[in-house]
């Protein structure tokens, strides 16, 4: 469904999700990590998503784990978002093999290699990809898009956008 629904990475790169879910046979992936760090100033779309649709984030992670045949999932969220940590933890509390990780608030905590290390203690080899450490990383928005596609059959045609700063009252 991820391919037919046009699901792409919602963290910014728009990499096709179905490609991430088909690692080379020599890469033994056993973990999926969702990136909820959103460490760039003024960006709050992922934060709002985790507050308003935490169940979709968790459901999407379960679907990604099932697609890859893995048993372990993490959702990494920086500690400057305690409300999001609480909401996502509540949504995931009864789901086996999913752990919400409170990440130290620092830049660039949301970068793939830092996120993988913070959640699993594994290091991605220099010049390597997350699959070299047995991990696939997706954004929380990507997981929510997967959930929406599964639940409604709707392709990816929209995303959450936030507006912030001095010009907003």
Please give the residue ranges for each predicted region:
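Iron-sulfur-cluster electron-transfer modules
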Residues: 1-116
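Hydrophobic alpha-helical positions that pack around
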Residues: 71-169
């Amino acid at each position: 469904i991820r391919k037919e629904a046009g699901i792409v990475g919602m963290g910014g790169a728009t990499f096709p999700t179905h490609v991430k879910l088909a690692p080379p046979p020599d890469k033994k992936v056993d973990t999926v990590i969702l990136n909820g760090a959103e460490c760039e100033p003024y960006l709050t779309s992922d934060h709002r998503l985790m507050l308003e649709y935490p169940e979709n984030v968790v459901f999407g992670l379960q679907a990604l784990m099932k697609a890859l045949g893995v048993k372990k999932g993490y959702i990494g969220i920086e500690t400057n978002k305690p409300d999001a940590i609480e909401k996502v933890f509540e949504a995931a509390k009864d789901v086996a093999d999913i752990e919400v990780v409170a990440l130290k608030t620092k830049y660039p905590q949301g970068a793939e290699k830092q996120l993988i290390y913070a959640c699993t203690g594994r290091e991605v080899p220099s010049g390597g990809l997350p699959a070299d450490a047995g991990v696939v990383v997706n954004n929380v928005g990507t997981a929510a898009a997967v959930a929406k596609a599964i639940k409604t059959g709707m392709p990816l045609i929209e995303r959450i956008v936030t507006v912030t700063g001095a010009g907003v009252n």
